[in-house]
Amino acid sequence: MGTGIGASEPDGSIPVRVAAYNVEFGRSTSPEQVGEMFKPYKLDIIGFNEVPDGDWTALVGKVLGMKHSYVGKISSANHKDKYKSILSRTPFEATVEHGLSVERRRSWNPASVVKAVTKVDGVAVAFYSLHICRSKDSHDTGHAYRLANEVLPKEKTNRVIVLGDFNNNLGDVAMNKLESSGFRATWEDLKIDTSKEFTYNALKPEQPNLGVIDHIFYNTGSRASTKEGGIIELKNPLSDHKPVWAEIVFPKRP
């Protein structure tokens, strides 16, 4: 499952090991259980959504030896304990939360994305963790549209990772919008056919599922590629979503 944590490749490229997990406000798990589950993956950064407020994220980090956490202030749809957070092995240089709410039928609000900039092996990476509403039928409204058109174009960091619960499948208009704005899903590099997999509902696998709605993207301008990754299949699910992970390798110079 890869070599170490934050260690350069022989060619000088920088591997960044990341994961995304919707923990359903911790209903079916504890932060300690989540930390133990993630241990084998030797992650650099984790993006959580539907995460409880307070020290929940930091407690996961305590298990993993990841000391730096940031929790946003906007809870999805104003529900209790549905925040977005970032857990990192390396210190943050900057953190911010961007609101993504829209006036649109069939859309819950508020929605947001949290961002942190950190250096992995001396190289700055901007990391976005989100939870947004499905917006399959529209190209110019919706949370994904605001993300792709208003937030990400302002990013100055050369290496960018965007992940979380998108509530959209690859091929949906919302996902196409993100990809056309210069982002690539790790599934494509890994040659994983997401139409044959699902990340929701992990607790009711026998029911009709929503397919893969949790994704990891990186900016194509960085010339990165995905070395490893996939959906983490748990015998005893810790949430209604499955966690997803990837090792993204960035060239030293984009």
Language-model features: where?
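Active-site neighborhood of phospho(di)ester-bond hydrolases with catalytic His/Asp-centered motifs
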Residues: 46-49, 71-73, 161-165, 185-189
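Active-site-proximal beta-strand elements of phosphoester/diester hydrolases
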Residues: 15-25, 123-134
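Active-site environment of divalent metal-dependent phosphoester hydrolases
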Residues: 25-29, 53-56, 135-137, 167-173, ...
